[in-house]
């Protein structure tokens, strides 16, 4: 589909067999910009927050296309602006989207590239809507089936309305999954550089998340 955008988001999609059902894979692309008052490094690069998340969305879109298969539901790949200012892009989308009631699931990425626990370099927090326990089952099964090198902290959340753009969708009662590797000393600092990312873990998270997205797009029920 043609890439479309506004001041609040950029998105593209792969049409599905069911024109009235959608899933969304998203991450925010904004960060903090430049601070001229700083003495040394003034650029907030945002490697983890949230170039890491954007990279996952792009690779999942690429993987969907590589299958050559049409998904059951239309898959929208979205890049939100204004997350750092209060989830502005995703809020705008859910408030203005004419088919929001037909969105069956949302997969979010925000900060998936660091090691909050240096002694556990494969650690990742896996948030998901508690009313959909199968989301936890999916990841457990895929880690075992494909020997994915991840150690998830499974966090089922009754109403996952905090933290990131997942909140905008949860407030619309849309089930969510959110990958996150927790905070670190470079959070919202100019020192959030690419040389501090755990690239191997990002790859494993992206593999696991593609399988999540595939299930969201193709499972009849969850």
Model feature map: region roles:
Residues 11-78, 95-98:
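Catalytic-core environment of secreted peptidases
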Residues 38-50, 66, 79, 121-130, ...:
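Second-shell loop/turn segments in exported
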Residues 31-37, 114-119, 185-189:
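Short acidic/His/Gly/Ser-rich catalytic and metal-binding motifs that mark active-site loops
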Residues 62, 66, 183-222:
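His/Asp/Glu-rich mid-to-C-terminal helical/loop segments that flank catalytic regions of hydrolases
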Residues 80-182:
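Metal-dependent peptidase/peptidase-like ectodomains
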Residues 1-5, 9-10:
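Single conserved hydrophobic/aromatic residue that forms the stacking wall/gate
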Residues 59-69, 95-99, 140, 144-148, ...:
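Sec-exported extracytoplasmic/periplasmic mature domains
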Residues 44-55, 69, 84-88, 129-134, ...:
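Soluble non-cytosolic domains of exported or imported proteins
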């Amino acid at each position: 589909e043609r890439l479309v955008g506004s001041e609040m988001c950029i998105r593209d999609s792969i049409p599905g067999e069911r024109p009235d059902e959608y899933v969304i894979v998203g991450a925010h692309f904004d960060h903090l910009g430049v601070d001229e008052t700083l003495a040394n490094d003034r650029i907030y690069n945002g490697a983890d927050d949230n170039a890491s998340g954007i990279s996952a969305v792009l690779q999942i879109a690429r993987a969907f296309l590589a299958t050559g298969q049409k998904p059951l539901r239309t898959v929208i790949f979205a890049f939100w602006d204004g997350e750092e200012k209060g989830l502005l892009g995703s809020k705008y989308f859910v408030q203005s989207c004419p088919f929001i009631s037909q969105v069956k699931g949302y997969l979010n990425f925000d900060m998936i590239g660091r090691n909050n626990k240096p002694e556990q370099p494969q650690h990742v927090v896996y948030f998901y809507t508690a009313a959909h326990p199968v989301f936890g089952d999916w990841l457990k099964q895929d880690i075992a089936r494909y020997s994915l090198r991840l150690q998830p902290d499974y966090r089922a959340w009754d109403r996952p309305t905090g933290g990131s753009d997942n909140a905008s969708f949860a407030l619309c009662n849309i089930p969510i999954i959110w990958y996150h590797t927790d905070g670190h000393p470079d959070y919202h600092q100019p020192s959030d550089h690419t040389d501090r990312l755990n690239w191997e873990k990002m790859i494993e998270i992206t593999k696991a998340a593609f399988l999540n997205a595939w299930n969201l797009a193709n499972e009849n029920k969850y």
